[in-house]
Amino acid sequence: VAEQGKHAPVLLILGQRGWQAERVFEQLDRPEELQGHVQELGTCNDEELAGWIGGARALLMPSFAEGFGLPVFEALELGTPVIASDLPVFREVGGGIPTYLDPQDSAAWKRTIEAFCADGPERQRQVAEIGAFQAPTWGDHFAKVEVWLARL
């Protein structure tokens, strides 16, 4: 926002504020600097959520830890490109489609977000590949579990 001013992209944060993210929220709670560029929506229904994610330029998941990665799954199902931390759970859910980044490399995140806003080649690659996304099923999950259990 400091560099791009009114041309900076809008960041919409969906969901409740998480734990152990106080420093992030300190930055977000400076409305005079971020007004109009950062918006928070704590709750919404499933239809609204699908509309927000489906209409996004990209879903951003700069996480340090995740249990399953449901937002990545939802975004890909809705045809929305994903920029996510390079975590095993995100790779398991998204395969080779999302763009994976080190969650601590803020310069890489900035470059990638700017490239996605400009519809750069990496975003175009994802858009082209999303149609082939195969969501994991319970059958897939249990097939893996059964193989694992057979090894015990």
Question: Which residue ranges define each predicted feature?
Answer:
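A charged, aromatic-enriched C-terminal amphipathic alpha-helix characteristic of glycosyltransferases
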Residues: 121-152
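Nucleotide-activated donor-binding/catalytic signature segment of Leloir-type glycosyltransferases, i.e.
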Residues: 15, 22-50
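Short beta-strand segments
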Residues: 10-16, 39-42, 62-63, 84, ...
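Short glycine-rich donor-binding/catalytic loop of glycosyltransferases
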Residues: 64, 80-94, 103-105
